[in-house]
Amino acid sequence: AYQIWGRGIPEEKVETLFSWCEFPEPDLTLWMDVPLEMAFARIESSRSSLDRIESGTKSFLERVCRGYEELALRYPKRIVRIDGTQSLENVANQIWNSLEVFLNQ
């Protein structure tokens, strides 16, 4: 999502590079979906600085979010959306439930 949607690198180039490098495709991806405003509020309350990705422009981060949405539509069995707006307990439960489903396949 970061390279293709965020940075605008053509998808074919990224796929070719991943194939050439023999990067394995993940069996499961847990996508923590949180609105940008909420994510930044949480970061500000827990850390003093942003990392390189978090320091990107708002439009870059919005494109990355759209990329994850697109990937989740393409790979619904592999990418599980976790509603990160919920309480910590509910998020943890969503993660455990997703892992249980995955491990029991």
Give residue spans per PLM region.
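NTP-dependent small-molecule kinase module
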Residues: 37-105
